[in-house]
Amino acid sequence: MKKKLYEGSSKILYSAEEDFLLIMAFSDKAVLETGETVDISGKGVLNNSISSFLMGKLEMIGIENHLIEKINMREQLIQYVEVFPIQVIISSVACGRFVKEFGMDEGYVFDKPIIDFKVRSREFNYPIVNEYQIFNFGWLTMDEIRTVQAQTLRIYDFLSGLFIGIGIRLVECKLEFGRVFNGEESIIMLTDEISPDNCRLWHINSNEKLGFELIENEPNKAFESYQLIANRLKEK
């Protein structure tokens, strides 16, 4: 029987039979900015499908990631990764904190994508951290930071093109990385998920918000939004 190891806001990790592998299950839960938890029935199934598809596409262009296989409607078999204590947020358009903290007009297009790092800590409200702090805190080496930045840009460029092809704009994406060890050597690997839960996705023509942004404002429309994204990706 599999053992529950960790439960987050939208995913649960279980032990697997093989060493260094885990089972990741997608739930229907979503945590609002207020801290309230809501259920969007069927969201987990769609996120599993979307993330499996996108991770598979990234593997094809040489981006190492934790996905081994999708094993059922809600679960994936994944590689164990020693996850870095940071989130990597890449934005090509003013949204979220750029509007709230800098007073920018939502939708303003940056000349180049902006990469931010945040500490993976709900307790401390995910504070922004810079690369020199990350290095001096002993979390990543400078070479690892550069690798993460380069991979983030490559991932974002690829996904942006893929989403444009289905009439959707990838405005922002939150990524997580970690180390996988092979003896004394290690490689940096993409982990967590890529889904409407951690990507800001807008209709390319109308800028209508899709995915998690709808859960905050129009939760009754959220499932249809996730389903639209999944259906369009199936056609690729």
Swiss-Prot record:
Gene Ontology, cellular component aspect: cytosol
A Gene Ontology molecular function term of the record: ATP binding
EC number: 6.3.2.6
InterPro entries to which the protein is assigned, alphabetical: SAICAR_synt/ADE2_N (IPR028923), SAICAR_synt_PurC (IPR033934), SAICAR_synthetase (IPR050089)
Superkingdom field: Bacteria
UniProt catalytic activity: 5-amino-1-(5-phospho-D-ribosyl)imidazole-4-carboxylate + L-aspartate + ATP = (2S)-2-[5-amino-1-(5-phospho-beta-D-ribosyl)imidazole-4-carboxamido]succinate + ADP + phosphate + 2 H(+)
Pfam families on file: SAICAR_synt
Record-linked PANTHER family: MULTIFUNCTIONAL PROTEIN ADE2, SI:DKEY-6E2.2
Protein name: Phosphoribosylaminoimidazole-succinocarboxamide synthase
Origin species: Rickettsia typhi (strain ATCC VR-144 / Wilmington)
Classification lineage: Bacteria, Pseudomonadati, Pseudomonadota, Alphaproteobacteria, Rickettsiales
